[in-house]
Amino acid sequence: MKVVLIGSVEFSLRALEKLIAIDVDLVGVCTKKSSTFNSDFFDLKPLCDINEVPCLYVDNINSTKNVEWIKNLNPDVIFCFGWSSLIKKDILAVAPMGVVGYHPAKLPKNRGRHPLIWALALGLKESASTFFFMDEGADTGDILSQVDFEISYQDDARNLYDKVVEIALIQIEEFIPALEKGTYTRIKQNEKESNDWRKRNELDGEIDFRMSSRSIYNLTR
């Protein structure tokens, strides 16, 4: 099974390390040389070079040139883990199995931006690590793998991120054989249960001391 990976954040790097470790046929990687958008940005090319994996720096992943580069690799499936823009239909149609994306929330609930930060700020006690088949919507495609996790009172943004990554890497190792054998299942999302989280801004982080102590704590996590 030939795989292309698209990504440019810390989780993308950890996923790339996992794919290499379990000897996946990784035929290409698309990443960014720099980013002012993602605080957890990582350039995947150095690791690709060490392991002789073809790597392309891209800005607009949906450009005709980049779509053709991916097409020429003839992937069976594309993994998009950690990309800040929507993947459009030209790339969605390239691989027979489509594009698998990732969202650390219990889809169909809590689609959209900054899911881990929103979960902490709102004081959620649980969420989920979700891989899904991407479509033209935002986090709306069929679910491939979903694992629940607890959010403890002690969790902050850093250790919650680490916790979710470890869960996601186990999921990757588990669902890849199912993709290879064609034994995976697709679970449609229930639109009646869905909601969307917006992009956070500076005002969302302001502390109002009329808030409860718990609410203030949640903002500082």
Residue ranges and their predicted role:
Residues 1-221:
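One-carbon transfer enzymes
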